[in-house]
Amino acid sequence: MDLPQALMQRGDRHGVRLLIAPTFALPDAALDAILSWRLGQYLLTRFYDADVVADQDLVREDAATVHSADVHGIAIDADGGLLTYLTLKQPEELEGFRYGSADRPPFPCEEVHGRSWQESIVDTDDVPAEQCWELARFITDQRRPDEPLIHRGALEIALVAARLASRPAFASRVRLVTGDLDPDIALRNLRYFFIPVATFAPHQVTLPKGHPLRPRYADHPTSPFIANARDLDWATFVRWADIDLALNSGEEETYLRFLLLRQFVSVKESSLKRPNAPRDQSQYPVEALTSPSSLGASDALWRSATSGAIPWQALTLGPGEPLPRDRVSWIVEGFAQALTYRPEGLAHLAGIGPEVCFVPHESIAASIASLDAATPLRVLTTTREDFESFWRQRQALFETSSEKLYGMTEIVRAAKA
């Protein structure tokens, strides 16, 4: 794990070690091992066509598809076993091109989905292409899906990679992140991390016969996506701090905290996405449904609530006053803090402000000790049913709908095991 040219190395935390390094920093044997592991995991998920892999005598993925500056993130257990892997990659020879250049080299996701979906995004054409990266191969060890350490590894490497890309030393090199995803898994998990992405209706893609990834796209509807690093704001960074606090706790407390954090959601959408126009009549104002930021939506909802046009209540609270615990709370202005129980007393659970809602889940709500205003606060409250009705309408226009609204289902399963 001692690589002088690594971008980040972290020692053991509750059984997980982390490494993020470019290809040129990895020994050849390490890269070969990673490519073999990637091939094996994609066979286990049935993303690869096993017959094609056998016919081509593949024992690892093709090293020719890995470029010198590609970045590899790995979470490793105490025995050196790989728990989770991800990569950020680019095609070669992007220098001098803009993201919107028609003749620039394509990213791998564009080779699958084409580029017509980019007609529905804005403010990307003039971004230097070398400031865009594709997030790919984010996968956990499929041989031990029920081990809590596997889920911890995924959370640890995702958090560290996101934070690293946001640091001043790297932020100028990472403006856009693209790729493709399964909306019912990856999209909800990005939502859990408060990372808004522009995405599109999932569809199936037929790759040429003999392509090893043909089953991945023929059998699993996927969507291309793109994220804007400038959409990350204080709400995102506070969320990451709350996730980090959970990961820094003991195993049982970690997964309880992740359960409880599902009750705090971001309603922000990507600034890159041009939303569809509402087709159906709605009691909610158009601005509330189509403003990417919830700040614009908040103002429209506040006006509608104060006029009685929607079944929401507008409240003004002072520091120390409790928010209602049996209703959704949409923060319009100010900051609130949620505390939870620990053996030695109460402890911080989550900080919430504009762009964040508290959505009580009846089965676990009692584990939140308090939810109080920390500053003067304007908040909208409503029932969970009415909030979810609004949220689904809003997601439909941005094409970010998923079957389930709340992320990290895998963590919930691990916590209940």
Where are these regions (language model features)?
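Acidic/histidine-enriched, beta-strand-rich ligand/metal-binding domains
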Residues: 366-415
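Acyl-donor binding region in acyl/amide transferases
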Residues: 99-221, 356-359
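Short acidic (Asp/Glu) patches
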Residues: 54-70, 102-122, 364-366
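Cyclic nucleotide-binding regulatory domains
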Residues: 96-110, 314-375, 384
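A short helix-loop-beta-strand connector motif used in the catalytic cores of GNAT acetyltransferases and
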Residues: 62-74, 94-97, 312, 326
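Short amphipathic alpha-helix that is part of the acyltransferase structural core
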Residues: 5-60, 72-82, 87-90, 277-309
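Cyclic nucleotide-binding regulatory module and flanking cytosolic helices
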Residues: 27-31, 267-319, 393-401, 406-410, ...
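Charge-rich, low-complexity intrinsically disordered segments
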Residues: 198-280
